[in-house]
Every structure is written in structure tokens, then in C-alpha cells.
Amino acid sequence: LESIGRVTVVAPATEQSGVGHSITYLTPLTCKQIYDGEIFRGWAVDGSPADCVKLGISELTPKPTDLIVSGINGGLNAGINVLYSGTVAAAIEGAFFRIPSIAVSLEEDPHADFEAAASIAVQLIQRILHHQGSAARLYNINIPTKATRDYRAGLAPEIHVLPMGVARYGDHYIKRQDPKGRNYYWSTNDPPPQPTEHPTDVMALANGHVTITPLHFDMTHQQQLSEMQSWSLALDSQSL
């Protein structure tokens, strides 16, 4: 990202997978500066990804902040996993501030090539910034392992702009017992997502393509809103 501009790193101090858009407000947030020898590398925040962006913009980074990039996450954040993702939540937090914000995730793999993924992501980010006048300010990029291998081999991976998949998957748990006979459960990705009638990010990633999805954080169902405003919802005036 330093090829684009000055970078300030503000990252969680501990693993935060699956925390969604949680924030810290009942306890104080602590953070510390991280150095590599004499070189300042960034801030480690004892909080969630959304905390990092909120605190970073408000207190830790130079003003103004022109771009938020969340990631690269080790593991895809596509389909309904967008709603569980701390990586995407950090980008959403940036969009709250009306700052162009981009989440980047790489398929989980023992030999995940973060360097190739970073090169792919930087090119896509530059192209997105070229269109800053567009309505969208929030984007979700996912990069499968096949795309990084193709990129290493000198082949340009296909880029697909698609909606997020909304099919439910990964609702199976493995049940086990601890030494005291108490049950506990491990979440799994089974059953895997099934093919859908319309193209989605999940399907394109399964075929080895890089995906970009424009998102927005306003969760209002606009069509239903208009319909509900015509409903008779007035309550009877009576005391309990």
C-alpha cells in the first residue's frame, strides 16, 4: 500500500475472527506502539477490528484519512460470512466516516501467498480509487488460492464483480466431550455452499476467480418500508 500513499497500521493485538462489528465501550481501550528495532510499524489495539478503525481515525492516524484497507485476512469473507466478518466490519466502520473503505481477504491455505494477494489487491484498489465519484464507498475483495498461483505464473486472474451470496451454509457442528463429560461443539464449514441460479461471490471464488462486491451498511428494506408505512399499526389506547 505504500505505493499508493502514507500507511498507518492499526491492528488488533489478538485474534479476532468472527467477531463481526463488535466494539468496546464498557471497558477502556488500550493500545501500544509496535517497533521493529528503530522502525515504527504501527499500533496494536486490545480491541476488535471495528475498534481499530474507530480509534485509529479519531486518535491515532494523521488527518485527513483518505482510505481504509482492512486485511489481508487469512480466510475468505464471502456470502453470508460477510455478516460475521471482523475484516468486513472494519471496512464498514471506515465507511461510517464517509471514507472509501475496502476489505481484502485471501483463501485459507497452508501455503497462502500473501505477497501475490497484496499485489493483486493494490492494483484493484488503485482502479477502485480511480472511480471515487461512484456512489459506493465500501467494497469487499476476495482472492482465492488459484488466483495467486495464476498470478505467480504470469497469468492475470479473472476479476468478477458480483453480489454476495445469501444461501445458508456451514451450519453443522462437531459434538465432543471434555474429560469431565461436558459437551462442547466445534463449528464447521459443512455442508458447503451449493450452486445457485444466479452468479454470486461464493460461486465465482469456488471457480478460482477474484471477486469484488460493493456493499452498503444501510440495512433498511426500502421496498418493505414503503409497504409497511401503509399498514394500520396504531395501538389501542388502554392502560394495563
Which residue stretches match the model-derived regions?
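Electrostatically charged, flexible surface regions
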Residues: 116-240
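Short beta-strand segments
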Residues: 11-12, 70-73, 104-105, 141-144, ...
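Short, Asp-centered acidic motifs that coordinate Mg2+ and/or phosphate
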Residues: 67
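Glycine/threonine-rich flexible loop motifs
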Residues: 76-85
